[in-house]
Amino acid sequence: MELLSGPHAFLLLLLQVCWLRSVVSEPYRAGFIGEAGVTLEVEGTDLEPSQVLGKVALAGQGMHHADNGDIIMLTRGTVQGGKDAMHSPPTRILRRRKREWVMPPIFVPENGKGPFPQRLNQLKSNKDRGTKIFYSITGPGADSPPEGVFTIEKESGWLLLHMPLDREKIVKYELYGHAVSENGASVEEPMNISIIVTDQNDNKPKFTQDTFRGSVLEGVMPGTSVMQVTATDEDDAVNTYNGVVAYSIHSQEPKEPHDLMFTIHKSTGTISVISSGLDREKVPEYRLTVQATDMDGEGSTTTAEAVVQILDANDNAPEFEPQKYEAWVPENEVGHEVQRLTVTDLDVPNSPAWRATYHIVGGDDGDHFTITTHPETNQGVLTTKKGLDFEAQDQHTLYVEVTNEAPFAVKLPTATATVVVHVKDVNEAPVFVPPSKVIEAQEGISIGELVCIYTAQDPDKEDQKISYTISRDPANWLAVDPDSGQITAAGILDREDEQFVKNNVYEVMVLATDSGNPPTTGTGTLLLTLTDINDHGPIPEPRQIIICNQSPVPQVLNITDKDLSPNSSPFQAQLTHDSDIYWMAEVSEKGDTVALSLKKFLKQDTYDLHLSLSDHGNREQLTMIRATVCDCHGQVFNDCPRPWKGGFILPILGAVLALLTLLLALLLLVRKKRKVKEPLLLPEDDTRDNVFYYGEEGGGEEDQDYDITQLHRGLEARPEVVLRNDVVPTFIPTPMYRPRPANPDEIGNFIIENLKAANTDPTAPPYDSLLVFDYEGSGSDAASLSSLTTSASDQDQDYNYLNEWGSRFKKLADMYGGGEDD
């Protein structure tokens, strides 16, 4: 196939025009402009002017010629090769028409080297006869960003390019051409100008990642997909091969078991396994250098790294280390750890291909053992599922098989271990036969009467003595013989005792203890089903009634009997002790209630009725009924109505009024006698004394009132330093008071120690200070205190008792006792 352009195409057009002139009377002229985009495709190479050789396909809607405005348009058609052009007319001939204001797309290669400005195409209007036309362009690349890429010569209409184009930035420019006359009037409609930038291979491929990571199981078959790498190229991959990327593997590390373990698809970049032999235990990871080349493998190249991780497959079976075990287990132990079995596995730790699963495959016919996997150590933990019996079987030989959680990837042998378990004999507790014994016993049997025999058996081979005791007997009704296990009545069995008997069953726990070292104890449960006897009479409820003495309504009493049928209902009733003179008792049809009613009038009062009830077993019960008769008609509900008597109200009100009057008088008297207490001392006189009148002999000594607030307030207000007006005191260290103890048991010592500290405290009252006594006036019988003496001489007085008053009176004791010089 050959594209025709230039002179060859022009010759072909001339041939067609010659044929047209032979059949059409009007002359036609043909011209050819190669830039107009007319494309002719001809098969063959011989282009003689007189003959068209090969097949001709006229592409497009026709050929546009711009010579003098005449247009010859040939539709799509063919001319058979070897025929004379004069005998091969086109399929259709259109009449000529004016040229159109159009321009086919302009293709401009990117990265052009110039020179610039470069002429691309020429705009030409057919309305330029007789007037001057001016051309202009608008659109992106002309008068809008990016501005200045294209311009047009105003008068000639040549479209100019001013700089290299970059297809990766802008693939296509859409401009509009305008034609106006000298006076500015538009002579043509705006024409669309498409400028398409054709690609050049100016970009290298780029991988989307520097390092790609993938994984594949070891031992997979060739052809298994591993991962996909991706590279991009900004060049055109649609119309050219510039952006078509081809992938390849440049290198592989390590090269084991050989250097071609993987392959990559040329177009998609998918990496696959090409050879067998992937073994994680030998090579856990491969590093591949992959290439991406544009031009479909013939252009620029870039590289990236692909890391292939080989995942573990269960291609290694676990192995026991060691393969034989021996263990000793006490009998009767449930859940006892017998042995831990250890295995090794070359697969990845803590993976399903590494975690072990154990199974007992032989030697455990009685299902006495179980084995589990330890979650951390992966060991098999063998434990007892049931208690082992030394007397039945003293040794067990178990066979344990190990596999993995994940199935084997390949066929592998399964490891088996042998565990020999020796059962150790222990002293077993006696066993009651049966463990829970149910018997019937009649209530009310005599004390000492045999109830049953409940014994136990010793499972040990040794002949040991068994003794029996009762561990739980809530009502203390039973006793057991320690040697024989005979159980007898120790109290009166009462089926109706709801505190101890539930649903007629009394439960007792019996113990059997052997003579082993150490002794062991077994338990048995004795369930006594107590049968009923007629030991309870019927009882009416309630036992108090209220009834009117006029047109009385019968009072219905319920009858209850703790015994069972046939020792209960139906009941019979009768009144005794002359109660039937005024009263009548009638039992209902069901026999479970009795109605009491008056036969004769009784005045309002309380009466006692003697009601005798008997059950179906003829057991009689006499009950006293308290009946309150009221003066009323019909039915009374709560109590007898009492008439209101107003004579009692007035005395009560009078008494209350008199009491209130008396209380008011007492209150006024107290307020009248109240005196305002005057302060004993003037504020400026800091005296702490009481004034006594010694001359009064009639009424005895009389204490004057004083203001207690003037005295010292105890330990809280003791001064830090006690001064004396006439003598400078000797300072003594203040004693340490013990704080209150938290333990109540120490409160005694706390009081004694703080009492001693208070006795020696110089800051405690009475203070050693100068006291000023009140002046008693002139002519006083005693001019001074020293004149008040009780004897003529101090020798007549005994001051030894002052020594017993403590440290605070030591000075006084020394003065009067002769211990200190005057």
Swiss-Prot record:
GO BP: cell-cell adhesion; hair cycle process; homophilic cell adhesion via plasma membrane adhesion molecules; keratinization; negative regulation of timing of catagen; negative regulation of transforming growth factor beta receptor signaling pathway; positive regulation of canonical Wnt signaling pathway; positive regulation of gene expression
Cellular compartments per GO CC: adherens junction; plasma membrane
Secretion signal span: 1-25
An MF annotation (GO) of this entry: calcium ion binding
Chief localization: membrane
InterPro entries registered for this protein in UniProt: Cadherin, Cadherin-like_dom, Cadherin-like_sf, Cadherin_CS, Cadherin_Y-type_LIR, Catenin-bd_sf
A Pfam entry, by short name: Cadherin
Residues that carry a glycan: N192, N558
Domain Cadherin: 100-207, 208-320, 321-432, 433-538, 539-645
Keywords, alphabetical: Calcium, Cell adhesion, Cell membrane, Cleavage on pair of basic residues, Glycoprotein, Membrane, Metal-binding, Repeat, Signal, Transmembrane, Transmembrane helix
Extracellular side: 100-647
Subcellular location: Cell membrane
Transmembrane segments: 648-670
Entries under CDD domains matching the protein: Cadherin_repeat
Known partners and oligomeric status: Interacts with CDCP1 and CTNNB1.
Function noted in UniProt: Cadherins are calcium-dependent cell adhesion proteins. They preferentially interact with themselves in a homophilic manner in connecting cells; cadherins may thus contribute to the sorting of heterogeneous cell types.
Domain free text: Three calcium ions are usually bound at the interface of each cadherin domain and rigidify the connections, imparting a strong curvature to the full-length ectodomain.
Protein name, UniProt field: Cadherin-3
Organism: Mus musculus
